[in-house]
């Protein structure tokens, strides 16, 4: 029985320039890859069947074009190139003739094995989680095509080879393109097992829970008749660079983002919300708003007032004329971001007395306490605070919902978690989730923000009220105002140091932060002893420190928070790596040598530290440092990857200004899926991490956000971006995720360089406000 791909609606794709001419008449889909015709692939050669789908991931056309479905959403990270190449590798497809189709929403079909089995594009789990799944998909498709050729030529299948979309029988010098075989394909009811030859394909450390069974049988005992997947030494596509499929349409204007989606007959809507999050409308004077030509509806929603009209200009003008009295929300109106941070810091200082949860430990607690009580041990500590941060995707939120007469509906939304959005919206619409078809356009940046529903919830409320197709648009001001931010966090790290041996014997982390997990997914929060691992997992140390303990506090405050790229790891590593340098300075030890002395059991960690020291010419540049310039080092193991980074920092004492001129980064992510994508991810992460470390913070006073747009929420400018040098340290280890790695070290690396210049570390993120208040003389650490 043939399994077909999810149906792709007939759509018209149009450039933004063309949209201006034909607005209101189009929708858009995501399909990448302009493919040339191939010799031998003709409609005449296979007149009866136009295409065949061996499984839900692959469709082979009679003209030789191969469509590959990508389960992950393209956020700019390269998923629509890296993931389809896993399929194409095992299929031996001609990459130039591959088109990429975006999957719809289905955990059952497209769920990520390393993300609770959900269709989840985040947490550096995309390439790792889908690696086996997609290789098997490609191998199944190749199996079908090879069996078809074997039947056609009456030869054993094991005598056949495949190369770039062609099946070959060298003994008889016969060949057939995949397209030529389509008409004869018979898809079996079941496929043989596939096994990997002694290859680890999943990371050992997985904070989403125990790693699930691999989807491929392992070489220790493959089933009889099982077929081996390719060994990495034979890869033709994986590990090699290739032009990204999504770049040409982005350059020529054909790419379809959520903001580009147009559905015939749709109305536009915007929602006015209160000055404090969570306020509901109490009384609405919409008389002036309804006078604006083109306005169809003004609706009170549970969380705001929606204005619906024929075009966005009318809607925006009408919304500005609304007069709304809002119901008080004393809980949220009492929130003050600075006060909350101070409370978190106090909790960290008194964590044990404040019922902190022991989230993780290495060694017995009695042994840890005993080491800290030893008279020959020096106790070093580091405390830090980190403000709320806006994820700041360049594309604000939008969503379209189109209801149908049979009670079903379709939705178009840029999201990192389509099935979660589907569930929220379907619940509001009063239909089953499978009655809401999800279309997933390109996303102009996710960074964790699009893990949570936003504009689609607005659209669902409006569509349920009026029964018409609606597109909801958020302005930049809406996006910032209604955003659940990266959590504020405080951390205290203590180290027991045996000075005579220059060794760290034990570490204690205490972390206090609010939780996104507790708010939206309490079942997972409870599974982690009512803690959020995204907040504290950064405290897990790969250094040779035998005794470690992490205590977590999750005080629930009234502001909504959401995961952000780097989660709490970027914040906790700021404290941890600053402390490591602080200890090295106390001991008059070189920061590189001190780390290497604590990485004897981590050859991968030691390798990236040595590599980045060589890249940055650490010994010479450190010796030449002075005059307000220094190098700073930070190292982080995370999600089966190892990263070391050196920053060259300049500090102007007279103006109290800090800048970063150069960054060197060595990264080991095990097997590399595509080198250029990994480097681009690291560069982007470093830039974002630099912006967050230096200047980004959200301030809330009495529940009111103190920012409205980028003029009062500053971010790093192009002129402030340093030279960035990334080197991949490839090993035979399992593939690791990449997306978050660049953010994790840049903050502490800058801080460590700053301390080498001034003798003191900064103890808050972002750094610029601390610099403005810093005394110009006298160390504080």
Curated annotation (Swiss-Prot):
Reaction equations catalysed: isoquinoline + A + H2O = isoquinolin-1(2H)-one + AH2
Mitochondrion is among the record's keywords: no
Entries under InterPro entries matching the protein: Ald_Oxase/Xan_DH_a/b (IPR000674), Ald_Oxase/Xan_DH_a/b_sf (IPR036856), AldOxase/xan_DH_MoCoBD1 (IPR008274), AldOxase/xan_DH_MoCoBD2 (IPR046867), AldOxase/xan_DH_Mopterin-bd_sf (IPR037165), N-heterocyclic_Hydroxylase (IPR052516), OxRdtase_Mopterin-bd_su_IorB (IPR012368), TAT_signal (IPR006311)
EC number annotated for this UniProt entry: 1.3.99.16
Function: Specific towards N-containing N-heterocyclic substrates, including isoquinoline, isoquinolin-5-ol, phthalazine and quinazoline.
Subunit structure, as described in the record: Heterodimer of an alpha chain and a beta chain.
Protein name in UniProt: Isoquinoline 1-oxidoreductase subunit beta
């Amino acid at each position: 029985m043939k399994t077909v791909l999810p149906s792709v609606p007939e759509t018209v794709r149009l450039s933004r320039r063309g949209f201006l001419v034909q607005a209101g008449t189009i929708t858009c889909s995501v399909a990448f890859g302009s493919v040339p015709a191939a010799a031998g692939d003709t409609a005449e050669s296979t007149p009866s069947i136009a295409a065949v789908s061996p499984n839900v991931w692959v469709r082979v056309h009679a003209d030789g074009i191969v469509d590959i479905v990508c389960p992950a959403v393209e956020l700019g990270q390269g998923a629509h190139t890296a993931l389809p190449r896993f399929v194409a590798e095992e299929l031996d497809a001609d990459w130039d003739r591959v088109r990429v189709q975006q999957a719809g929403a289905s955990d059952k079909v497209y769920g990520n094995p390393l993300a609770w089995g959900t269709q989840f594009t985040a947490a550096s789990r995309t390439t790792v989680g889908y690696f086996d799944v997609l290789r098997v998909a490609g191998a199944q498709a190749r199996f079908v095509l090879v069996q078809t050729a074997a039947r056609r030529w009456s030869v054993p299948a094991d005598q056949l080879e495949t190369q770039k979309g062609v099946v070959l029988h060298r003994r008889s010098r016969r060949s057939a393109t995949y397209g030529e075989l389509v008409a004869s394909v018979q898809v079996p009811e079941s496929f043989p097992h596939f096994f990997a030859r002694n290859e680890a394909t999943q990371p050992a450390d997985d904070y989403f829970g125990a790693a699930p069974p691999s989807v491929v049988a392992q070489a220790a005992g493959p089933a009889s008749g099982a077929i081996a997947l390719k060994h990495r030494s034979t890869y033709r596509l994986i590990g090699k660079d290739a032009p990204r499929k999504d770049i040409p349409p982005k350059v020529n204007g054909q790419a379809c983002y959520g903001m580009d989606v147009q559905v015939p007959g749709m109305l536009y809507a915007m929602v006015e919300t209160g000055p404090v999050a969570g306020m509901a409308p109490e009384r609405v004077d919409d008389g002036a708003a309804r006078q604006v030509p083109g306005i169809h509806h003004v609706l009170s929603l549970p969380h705001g007032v929606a204005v619906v009209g024929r075009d966005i200009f009318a809607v925006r003008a009408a919304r500005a004329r609304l007069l709304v009295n809002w119901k008080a929300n004393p809980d949220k109106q009492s929130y003050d971001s600075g006060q909350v941070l101070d409370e978190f810091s106090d909790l960290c200082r008194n964590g044990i007395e404040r019922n902190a949860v022991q989230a993780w430990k290495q060694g017995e607690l009695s042994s840890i306490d005993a080491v800290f009580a030893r008279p020959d041990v020096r106790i070093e500590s580091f405390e830090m605070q980190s403000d709320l941060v806006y994820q700041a995707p360049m594309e604000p939120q939008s969503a379209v919902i189109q209801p149908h007469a049979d009670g079903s509906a379709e939705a178009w939304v840029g999201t990192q978690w389509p099935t979660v959005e589907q569930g929220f919206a379907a619940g509001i619409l009063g239909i089953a989730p499978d009655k809401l078809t999800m279309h997933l356009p390109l996303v102009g940046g996710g960074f964790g923000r699009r893990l949570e529903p936003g504009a689609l919830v607005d659209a669902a409320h409006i569509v349920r009220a009026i029964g018409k197709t609606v597109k909801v648009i958020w302005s930049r001001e809406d996006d910032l105002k209604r955003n659940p931010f990266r959590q504020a966090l405080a951390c205290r790290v203590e180290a027991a140091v045996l000075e005579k041996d220059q060794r760290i014997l034990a570490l204690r982390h205490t972390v206090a932060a609010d939780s996104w997990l507790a708010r939206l997914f309490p079942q997972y929060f409870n599974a982690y002893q009512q803690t959020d691992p995204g907040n504290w997992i950064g405290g897990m140390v790969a250094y040779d420190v035998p005794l470690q303990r992490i205590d977590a506090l999750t005080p629930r405050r009234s502001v909504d928070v959401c995961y952000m790229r780097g989660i709490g790891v970027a914040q906790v590593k700021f404290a941890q790596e600053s402390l490591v340098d602080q200890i090295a300075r106390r001991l008059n030890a070189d920061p590189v040598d001190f780390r290497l002395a604590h990485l004897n059991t981590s050859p991968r960690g030691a390798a990236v530290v040595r590599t980045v020291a060589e890249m940055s010419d650490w010994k010479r540049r450190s010796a030449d440092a002075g005059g307000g310039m220094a190098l700073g080092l930070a190292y982080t193991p995370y999600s089966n990857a190892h990263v070391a980074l050196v920053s060259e920092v300049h500090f102007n004492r007279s103006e109290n200004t800090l800048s970063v001129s150069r960054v060197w980064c060595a990264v080991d992510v095990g097997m590399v899926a595509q080198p250029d994508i990994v480097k681009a991810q690291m560069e982007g992460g470093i830039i974002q991490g630099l912006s967050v470390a230096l200047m980004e913070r959200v301030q809330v006073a009495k529940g009111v956000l103190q920012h409205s747009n980028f003029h009062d929420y500053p971010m790093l400018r192009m002129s402030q971006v340093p030279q960035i040098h990334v080197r991949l340290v490839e090993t035979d280890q399992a593939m690791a995720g990449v997306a978050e790695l660049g953010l994790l070290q840049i903050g502490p690396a800058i801080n460590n360089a700053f301390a080498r210049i001034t003798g003191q570390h900064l103890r808050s993120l972002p750094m610029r406000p601390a610099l403005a208040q810093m005394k110009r003389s006298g160390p504080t650490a």
